[in-house]
C-alpha cells in the first residue's frame, strides 16, 4: 500500500491540465512532430508517435492538425526544428524535479527554467543530479472502487510489470513504456478504463509535503508547467491537500 493522498494529487493534476487546454494543442503538436522526426511516420512501428497521436485524439485535435504535424516531423512540410532538452533540480524539502522541454532556443529555455526554480524556492541542479531517482515507464491510474483482484489479473495477463494499491483505494498499473498503448487498449477491452494514463518518469521514492511546503511546491510546479517550452514536469513530491 502507498500514497494516502495519491488520488488527490492525480485529480489536482487533471484539473490543472484542463485549465490550460489552450496550451495543450501546442505541446501535442510539438510532441507529434518530434516523435515523427525521431522514429518515422508509421504509428505501428513508432510507439512514441502512437502515444502522442492518441493523446491528441483524446483532446479532440482536428485530424488535419495531427497529419500536418506528422508530415512536418517526417520532413514532408517545412516547420520549426525543435531540440529536446531536460533540466533537473530540487524543489521544496529537497523533492526531485525533472523538466522536459522542446525548444528552438535552448538559451532562452534554460534561462526561463532557472528563473522559475529560483523564484519559487527551488534550486536548478546539474545534469543527472536527480534522474537516477526516476524510472521510465507506462503508468495507468484507476479510480477507488475498481475491482482490485480482477484488474490485477487482467493487467498481469496483458503484460503489465506491476500493480500497486494505494491507501486511498486508487490502483496503479505500471508497464514497459513501449507496451503502454497495447496494455491500455487490452484493459479497456476488458472493461477497465483508466482515469489517467501516460508514459512518464515515475519517482522511485516519494517526498511527502504538507501545509505551507505543499503550497510552495505547487507554485513551483505550476510556474514550470506554464513555461511555453516545457512539455512535462516530473517530481518526487506528493502534496497533502
Swiss-Prot record:
- Which InterPro entries does this entry report, sorted A to Z? Integrase-like_N, TACO1_YebC-like_2nd/3rd_dom, TACO1_YebC_N, Transcrip_reg_TACO1-like, Transcrip_reg_TACO1-like_dom3, YebC-like
User: Subcellular localization, per the record?
Assistant: Cytoplasm
Gene Ontology biological-process entries: regulation of DNA-templated transcription
Keyword set, alphabetical order: Cytoplasm, DNA-binding, Transcription, Transcription regulation
- Is Disulfide bond given among the entry's keywords? no
Say which family it is in.
Belongs to the TACO1 family.
Protein name from the UniProt record: Probable transcriptional regulatory protein LHK_02347
Q: Which organism is it from?
A: Laribacter hongkongensis (strain HLHK9)
